[in-house]
Regions:
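Extracytoplasmic, non-cytosolic globular domains
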Residues: 222, 229, 274, 289-302
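A structural motif
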Residues: 263-276, 287
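A domain-start/cap signature at the N-terminus of enzymes
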Residues: 1-125, 137-138, 143, 210, ...
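Conserved alpha/beta-hydrolase "acid-adjacent" motif
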Residues: 285-290, 355
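Active-site-adjacent mobile loop/cap segments within catalytic or ligand-binding domains
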Residues: 344-358
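Post-His helix in hydrolase/transferase enzymes
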Residues: 323, 359-371
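Short beta-strand/loop motif that positions the catalytic acidic residue
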Residues: 277-279, 283
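Serine-hydrolase catalytic machinery in alpha/beta-hydrolase-like enzymes
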Residues: 2-6, 93, 99, 112-208, ...
Length: 384
């Protein structure tokens, strides 16, 4: 609720006597009904009351909020539209400090009618994991996900790997210490995601994760172990969970296609995770067979859960930003409800790079179909 508290405090500073002060009283009463953190509210309120002309009136409102029973709002009061923000922040986890970037889109004015559900004001969250030799701002520039998120709207979280954890800034998807739910990088990424959900107006049922290369491999691991947190996953030029257990097996998997868990593995099939995969068939860094294995595991899990899938080849519908479109084989596995649960975009002559990305970032292929747009479209079909 801290996000809303800050917004309402700013509203209080702008309010004046008379009708607007009465409206502010209703806003704060509604906040108290939805959030038990009264001390936090009081702190923000006192800061708002620092303007001499309002001190007495605001003190009266504070007393009224404590003593007066709730009554329905008589009219709608809203703030001005909130501007977009792309900020650099720090997250502490198990003694380490992790940098991350967060994009918050230009959100509409807050609906403050008592009859309006708070859930209606919440937006999706997409977690984006960069690849090796990248950082968060670079990945944001290359994928242009922020520009798309501004229109959706949704928040975008860009965690950043520690240089001391991997000299190339790769996520350690190949290390057994970072392949489970409760330890290592997957645990950190899940904890960071939950913190953002708690602090910003995020719909917890519409949270997604995607990544490129090592980031794609880590996204697959994190999603597989956190089906209670993520509603879908996107893997671009990555590898399936279980493809490697050390550096040597990682290089082997990258060269020839990694070993994924067998389709009959109960641990792999216990939860269904909608999955979209992008992979260039000319990728010389991560073998395209890895994309095939991710799709195989995802469809096997769906079949085992009783979801009947229809496989179809869908014509390409998203041109590249440059207008020079690479031919793409898009395979869609959809269910009776017409939603696609698995998609595989195999990009002809596509390199080891984010398809349809901007040259402003590293490891991008501006000539490919727009992977960011395709992933967002796929994600928004699904919720937990």
């Amino acid at each position: 609720m801290s996000f809303w508290i800050n917004e309402l405090a700013r509203a209080a500073r702008r309010s004046n006597m008379g009708r607007q002060m009465a409206a502010a009283e209703r806003l704060f009463r509604r906040l108290l009904r939805k959030d038990s953190a009264v001390p936090v509210f009081t702190t923000a309120f006192v800061a708002a009351a620092s303007e001499p002309a309002h001190t007495e009136a605001l003190a009266d409102i504070t007393a009224t909020l404590i003593a007066t029973p709730e009554t329905p709002a008589e009219q709608e009061v809203s703030l001005k539209p909130r501007r977009a923000a792309f900020t650099r922040q720090v997250f502490q986890f198990e003694g380490e400090r992790y940098d991350f970037n967060l994009y918050v889109p230009p959100l509409p004015p807050l609906p403050l009618l008592a009859s309006t559900s708070e859930a209606q004001t919440r937006v999706p969250l997409v977690v984006m994991l960069h690849g090796c030799k990248q950082d968060s701002p670079d990945f944001a520039r290359g994928t242009t996900m922020n520009e798309l998120a501004a229109k959706t709207p949704c928040l975008v979280l860009y965690p950043e790997q520690l240089a001391k954890a991997n000299q190339m800034r790769c996520w350690n998807w190949f290390d057994s210490a970072h392949q489970g739910r409760h330890a290592g990088e997957p645990a950190m990424l899940a904890a960071l995601t939950r913190q953002v959900i708690a602090r910003y107006p995020v719909d917890p049922k519409r949270v997604y994760i995607a990544g490129l290369s090592a980031g794609g491999a880590m996204a697959a691991i994190v999603a597989a172990h956190n089906p209670d947190l993520f509603a879908a996953v996107g893997v671009h030029s990555g590898l399936p969970p279980g493809a490697a257990h050390d550096v040597m097996s990682a290089f082997s998997a990258m060269r020839s296609g990694g070993r994924s868990r067998a389709p009959g593995d109960a641990a792999a099939l216990k939860d269904v995770m909608p999955t979209i995969v992008f992979h260039g068939d000319a990728d010389r860094t991560v073998h395209p067979d890895n994309g095939d294995r991710i799709v195989l595991a995802a469809t096997a899990a769906l079949n085992a859960s009783g979801v009947a899938l229809k496989r179809s080849i869908v014509p390409q519908e998203m041109p590249a930003p440059t207008g020079e479109l690479r031919h793409t084989l898009r395979t869609v596995y959809s269910a009776e409800d017409q939603r696609s649960y698995v998609e595989y975009w195999s990009v002809e002559a596509g390199p080891h790079a984010w398809s349809g990305g901007s040259a402003a970032g590293s490891f991008t292929d501006p000539h490919g179909p727009n992977a960011s747009a395709a992933m967002l479209t796929f994600f928004l079909q699904h919720h937990r």
